[in-house]
């Protein structure tokens, strides 16, 4: 039978360790010593109910109890031998839960409630070398159902294997009879009890959280024992949120949602935080571009045009003189084949209008309608600042321009035009009104004024519109071909020749326009069939020259796709 050991020591600090001694049949003294190396500190209540048995909330940290066994002479306790590893017996430790303060039992309190302690309350001994060479009892799965303040009470039980290790004065165990079934004759003897420090069981809302695993738990786990290890702090801060290390994101989100009057005096920096309006009229950009083109009166002073304006290409070798302003003290640098300034300003016959000089700060323009031909740039002369006068156009704008195929903004649209005597008559020939017939673009009186205007198109403004000269009949065509022009220099385009097309000398394959007629060419960038500007450095002769050349033996020769050369009379359209 199990014998009762000495009563447990009083509670307090001395309750963390306890020891007891007994005398064996051989007259030896054996001492048992229990020491709680790791005390429980906190736990979360796992609650009551049908699922409470699966809700494991172990006590943190897990309790660890150390067992040491010593053997000595009954009359001399100074010479003790540690026999923990060589003692032949079985030990286990049983844990019970007790309240911190004992509750007096009433007369009518006969029925105890449901058990508060859950989990595995029994632990076997594990012989380890660290932290000390001893036996250890580990309780990694102890849970408490209700919140409160409790203590653990650990009871040590021993199962003796050798009869000589039995306690002195007890009856010897009967020897088992072979081949006869009988009840087991082994007994468990209670040795001693040790009580832990009080710990608190919290509810789910008040639980502060779990801490990292202690060095003792890590050391025991490294030796193969079942202990749950946590490498980070799992603390829950639900109570007073006073520090900024764990709710920084919440405060930052609150600051971003604050109204503008709490932010600061800088209204431009906090503008994106204001609520947006659903009205389209209130979302207009104050610095956006105007929806209409301002007139010349709104702009006032002339402004230089910062970008290049694409214009229709003209024959590369031919160029026309541009009259220089009268206040210029010296000659102006002009392209090749330019006559002297005196001849440029000489009066011309009434049928030949003068070209207006370019305005101030006119940049060079580059043609974008070359269609594969070499693009040319003509530098504009730098003129001095001259007082200018505003000229109001007298006729509506005609979109069917005989010079350019796409209307582009020029500098003169933002500047007042310069008051030169021949500027109004030049633009009248350049832009016919809507009431004029379409065949007026190829009349002979306009040929001499159109050719210089094509070359000077990239240097002169195009917003001044005046009246057109009178239209001459077709019967006067032969007489007008021999009229001289004093304001136009010699140009390859003005020399008579038997060819229908005027082309530059190129050592490459002929283009599409060289083999096909005027109406067969593709139209790009707003080009019109009645336009007289042709890409690729080619310009078609007027209709009166074609009619005169048709009487001759001129034929058009072209190469077919199979490589055979074919010639036929030129087709007039």
UniProtKB/Swiss-Prot annotation:
This is Developmental and secondary metabolism regulator veA. Changing residue 183 to A: Leads to strong light induction of conidiation. Residues 1-24, 39-63, 236-295, 307-367, 384-573 are annotated as: Disordered. GO terms for cellular component: cytoplasm; nucleus. Induction: Expressed almost constitutively at an increased level throughout the asexual and sexual developmental processes. Negatively regulates its own expression. Expression is derepressed in light-illuminated conditions. Expression is regulated by laeA. Regulates its own expression, depending on its phosphorylation state. It comes from Emericella nidulans (strain FGSC A4 / ATCC 38163 / CBS 112.46 / NRRL 194 / M139). The modification Phosphothreonine is found at residues 167, 170. Its main location: nucleus. Component of the heterotrimeric velvet complex composed of laeA, veA and velB; VeA acting as a bridging protein between laeA and velB. Interacts with the light-sensing phytochrome fphA. Interacts with llmF. Residues 459-498 are annotated as: PEST. Coiled coil: none annotated. A motif (Nuclear localization signal) lies at residues 41-46.
